[in-house]
Amino acid sequence: MASELEYESVLCVKPDVSVYRIPPRASNRGYRASDWKLDQPDWTGRLRITSKGKVAYIKLEDKVSGELFAQAPVEQYPGIAVETVTDSSRYFVIRIQDGTGRSAFIGIGFSDRGDAFDFNVSLQDHFKWVKQESEISKESQEMDSRPKLDLGFKEGQTIKLSIGNITTKKGGTSKPKTAGTGGLSLLPPPPGGKVTIPPPSSSVAISNHVTPPPIPKSNHGGSDADILLDLDSPAPITTPAPAPVSASNDLWGDFSTASSSVPNQAPQPSNWVQF
């Protein structure tokens, strides 16, 4: 059944090949093309290599009609079905067979060395593929013969999964995770934002407050005008050191007191006239 499903594929086609009758081999040494009548081939035609499954077929056909002249099945290469001669790379010896099982050895040759190279490589590639297929099939059979590992659950078997602080098991419920006291933190202000400083409270004293210096008073309570007039007097007026003024006195109160006392003082026209 498998052979019926296999299809035939063409591996190589060469339009010009010569066929020679070869003398029987007298010893174990290889065939020599110089023993053949190379200038008088017994048949010329076309060579075609096909494959069906693992077997390759060398077919000698007529150039015009394509009628089959001879066929050589090849099950192994290199092997007895195809041999190379010892004195040339363009000639080979193949074993042909007919439908009745009879076989014979004939010589074939190519006029071009490149055609002989393609003939040789086509057979090598085919049997290399056959070898790889055999190894793959053997490995697959070994895999099938090995005991399979049963990873399934047995009857009534359960499992327990632990994910972080949440424990889940059959028939149970998961407990919600409580947030810790130090879990939350304030986010920093966005870039470019302004930080507003709150104003100080009324209960906080201002440390940089400066107490204004006291203003000395004259012994007779004169005004600012009197002080200017006294600059031209011949003898300076010495006044005793004023009593220290407390920080609670208002600076503007002293000025108002001096201004209010100006009308009560008598002007000194003599000193102003001399100036």
UniProtKB/Swiss-Prot annotation:
Region entry Disordered, spans: 166-190, 215-275
Motif WXXF motif 1: positions: 252-255
Keywords annotated in UniProt: Cell membrane, Cytoplasmic vesicle, Endocytosis, Membrane, Phosphoprotein, Protein transport, Repeat, Transport
GO annotation terms (biological process): endocytosis; protein transport; vesicle-mediated transport
Composition bias type Polar residues, residue spans: 256-275
Motif segment (WXXF motif 2): 272-275
PTM-bearing positions, type Phosphothreonine: T211
CDD domains assigned to the protein according to its UniProt record, in alphabetical order: PHear_NECAP
Biased composition (Low complexity): 167-179
Main location: membrane
Compartmental location: Cytoplasmic vesicle, Clathrin-coated vesicle membrane; Cell membrane
GO cellular component: clathrin vesicle coat; clathrin-coated pit; plasma membrane
Family annotation (PANTHER family): ADAPTIN EAR-BINDING COAT-ASSOCIATED PROTEIN 1, ATP-BINDING CASSETTE ABC TRANSPORTER-RELATED
Function, in words: Involved in endocytosis.
Family membership noted in the UniProt record: Belongs to the NECAP family.
Subunit structure: Interacts with AP1G1 and AP2A1 components of the adapter protein complexes AP-1 and AP-2. Interacts with the GAE domain proteins GGA1, GGA2 and GGA3.
Domain remark from Swiss-Prot or TrEMBL: The WXXF motifs mediate binding of accessory proteins to the ear-domain of AP-1, GGAs and AP-2 through hydrophobic interactions. Selective binding to the GAE domains of AP-1 or to the alpha-ear domain of AP-2 is tuned by the acidic context surrounding the motif and the properties of the second residue of the motif itself. The WXXF motif 1, which is preceded by an acidic residue and has a glycine in second position mediates specific interaction with AP-1. The WXXF motif 2, which is followed by the C-terminal carboxyl group negative charge, allows specific interaction with AP-2.
Name of the protein this chain belongs to: Adaptin ear-binding coat-associated protein 1
Originating organism: Bos taurus (Bovine)
The organism's taxonomic lineage, starting at the top: Eukaryota, Metazoa, Chordata, Craniata, Vertebrata
Gene: NECAP1
